């Protein structure tokens, strides 16, 4: 990608409207000082003393953080949190982010706030040591009245959208934001607006999804097509191309250290290698950075390869940020690409 092309694409970000619908969660980091370890007088069990607590939006919020870091002008968030303390923290964090519209993000007593609580042992001079995570989730189906709000919000917000991102983060179907009813609404939107990028990613794979843009890994691609995960790049390109033509929508397949493959319904396929790794890494959040950068770039009119190059640069920047779920800004991308 030339410097002029990079500037042309990223220069359009402030004018973009991106809709982000999905499972927003609260990432809460508990920083523990191992030197302050005590023993409980009452139970005799070890006590870990938390010296700092920091919280940030996770799940779909990680995609949001990356869109904000890119300088996307307006981001419409659609989702829910619980009417609880974690929900208050999450809403407060969302409202502080530049360009983020939260009027369609609701707190409801019918749901708990999806929370990842991550205890970290802080060792001087070395990366944090992550202990067992504590999760808070919903286990019952999302109520119909909440689904109705989500579908109505999607229809309203997408009118002026340049791109829509949908993230299904929950392990149990229909307990989060992207229920079967919401997936149907996304399919209807994509059919009605063939020029609009609707990019979907799901923790459980994209089987049963309507014809929208897909972002997945090789194992998910193989499973979706009823076979094994393709191992050769040419096979990934072939299968991604077949799926893109079948759905009439773009397909992106992440390949970890081997980069990413993208395919368009027109038959165009590309492979962009990953950038080199430098020292310790943490892959958490890399996939969300890829989603954000693909959507922003394609929404801004980027060609397939340019969008994928930006996504790979973002992923490389994010994995080198330890002890947090990182982001990548436009100046950082420019430096990473050597422009």
What are these model-predicted stretches?
Residues 15-18, 26-166, 332-339:
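Conserved N-terminal subdomain of the carbohydrate kinase-like
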Residues 19-21, 133, 162-167, 199, ...:
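Structural motif
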Residues 24, 169, 289:
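Active-site metal-binding loops of divalent metal-dependent hydrolases
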Residues 28-29, 224, 263, 318, ...:
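Residues that scaffold the ATP/ADP-binding catalytic core of kinase and kinase-like folds
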Residues 36-44, 211-219, 259-287, 336-337:
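Flexible glycine/proline-rich, aromatic-decorated loop/lid segments
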Residues 171-269:
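Conserved phosphate/ATP/ADP-binding segment of small-molecule kinases
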Residues 241, 246-247, 275-336:
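Conserved post-catalytic alpha-helical subdomain immediately downstream of the catalytic base
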């Amino acid at each position: 990608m030339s410097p002029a092309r990079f500037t042309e694409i990223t220069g359009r970000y402030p004018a973009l409207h991106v809709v982000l619908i999905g499972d927003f969660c609260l990432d809460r980091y508990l920083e523990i000082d191992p030197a302050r370890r005590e023993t409980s007088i009452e139970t005799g069990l070890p006590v870990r003393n938390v010296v700092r607590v920091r919280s940030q939006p996770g799940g779909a919020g990680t995609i949001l953080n990356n869109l904000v870091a890119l300088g996307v002008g307006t981001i419409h968030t659609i989702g829910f949190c619980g009417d609880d303390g974690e929900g208050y923290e999450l809403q407060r964090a969302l409202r502080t982010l530049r360009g983020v519209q939260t009027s369609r993000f609701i707190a409801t007593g019918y749901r708990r706030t999806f929370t990842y609580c991550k205890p970290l042992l802080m060792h001087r001079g070395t990366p944090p040591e992550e202990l067992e995570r504590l999760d808070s989730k919903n286990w019952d189906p999302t109520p119909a009245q909440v689904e109705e709000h989500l579908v109505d919000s999607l229809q309203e917000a997408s009118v002026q959208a340049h791109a829509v991102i949908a993230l299904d983060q929950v392990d149990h179907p229909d307990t989060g934001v992207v229920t079967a009813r919401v997936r149907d609404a996304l399919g209807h939107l994509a059919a009605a607006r063939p020029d609009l990028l609707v990019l979907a990613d799901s923790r459980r794979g994209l089987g049963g999804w309507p014809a929208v843009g897909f972002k997945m890994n090789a194992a998910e691609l193989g499973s979706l097509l009823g076979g094994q995960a393709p191992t050769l790049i040419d096979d990934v390109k072939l299968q991604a191309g077949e799926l893109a033509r079948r759905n009439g929508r773009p397909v992106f397949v992440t390949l970890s250290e081997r980069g990413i493959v993208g395919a368009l319904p027109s038959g165009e396929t590309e492979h962009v290698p990953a950038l080199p790794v430098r020292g310790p890494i943490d892959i958490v959040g890399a996939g969300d950075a890829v989603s954000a950068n693909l959507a922003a770039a394609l929404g801004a009119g980027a060609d397939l390869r340019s969008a994928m190059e930006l996504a790979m640069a973002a992923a490389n920047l994010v994995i080198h940020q330890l002890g947090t779920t990182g982001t990548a800004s436009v100046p950082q991308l420019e430096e990473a690409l050597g422009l």
